[in-house]
Amino acid sequence: MHLLDTLAEGLKEIDARGLRRRRRTADTPCAAHMTVDGRAIIGFASNDYLGLAAHPQLIAAIAEGAQRYGAGSGGSHLLGGHSRAHAQLEDDLAEFVGGFVENARALYFSTGYMANLATLTALAGRGTTLFSDALNHASLIDGARLSRADVQIYPHCDTDALSAMLEASDADVKVIVSDTVFSMDGDIAPLPRLLELAEQHGAWLIVDDAHGFGVLGPQGRGAIAQAALRSPNLISIGTLGKAAGVSGAFVAAHETVIEWLVQRARPYIFTTASVPAAAHAVSASLRIIGGEEGDARRAHLQQLIGRTRAMLKATPWLPVDSHTAVQPLIIGANDATLEIAATLDRAGLWVPAIRPPTVPTGTSRLRISLSAAHSQADLDRLEAGLQQLGAKAA
């Protein structure tokens, strides 16, 4: 069979199982109210948790950065592409999130996926055992596979099982890997216990704070700051295209760890540095996140989270016990989930249907993503739509 025929058959199978993914095209900036595929909608799909993606100060910072540093970096960070904007952002990030370790540094990446691959492949290898939460993000899973380390998967947030696995391991190097906020469930990892286990067993703890950075902790400094953790064994990874409203990612750790990544992390070394203007805008975003406006946006977001939790409990479906901006509602079957999402879409509400392989079979769900840009009136619309669908399903 020709390769194209093989792919076509595979696509037919994806369609038959109700698993084909389709891109939608936004005609306006990321915001609570958008025009998508030519239609006005209220969006509950983005990870713009603080509503900063269209913030006037960040738009101005992008323009200023482009005027100062140009449209592109022109090279990799080690071959001419490392600009003053990148260097300044790394200093800003180290100061903002690096309080968990002495002599902290930060390293800026183009994407969170690259940051996770870079960290795991540079720090782990043969002779290393990675202990990975069962619901970790795909980029952590792929990084673990590419590292060539032995990988042991522990049940989701089950620290008793993890403890037993660590006790039984005779690996030269042990690394615990976990999301902080899990992207499809919205729950938070037991970070204090994970760090306790890491220190007991002389292990690294690498956490991906993609959905916690900017939202959790004092001044939005993230899940590690919220848990008040400090340790040289700790490495924090965060993204800058979610709550920060721009793009990119970072790794924060002791300066020796960061220098090792500069020397050995292939996804950092062998790629063109990101647009300097984006780095310039992220520095502006950090000032908003850590200031009074950031506090006000987080407070409003918490109000929306509380209301949404109560709203979802009143439906005939299964809400996940999430206290974060990720509010899942488990429907179960793929077809039913797609139909509910389509009905909400016809009512002008964009609520994504999440299906396998992103989530386990039988747990297809609506993933309601809240933003400080949403108003109570936006939630009124969502609540009305869910109530109508719930009445039909009851």
Curated annotation (Swiss-Prot):
Residues that coordinate or bind pyridoxal 5'-phosphate: G112, Y113, S183, H211, T239
Keyword entries, A-Z: Biotin biosynthesis, Pyridoxal phosphate, Transferase
Keyword Transferase attached: yes
GO molecular function: 8-amino-7-oxononanoate synthase activity; pyridoxal phosphate binding
Pathway: Cofactor biosynthesis; biotin biosynthesis
Record PTM N6-(pyridoxal phosphate)lysine, positions in chain: K242
Top-level enzyme category: transferase
Domain of life: Bacteria
GO terms (BP aspect): biotin biosynthetic process
Role of this protein: Catalyzes the decarboxylative condensation of pimeloyl-[acyl-carrier protein] and L-alanine to produce 8-amino-7-oxononanoate (AON), [acyl-carrier protein], and carbon dioxide.
Assembly behavior: Homodimer.
Protein name as catalogued: 8-amino-7-oxononanoate synthase
Highest classification ranks of the organism: Bacteria, Pseudomonadati, Pseudomonadota, Betaproteobacteria, Burkholderiales
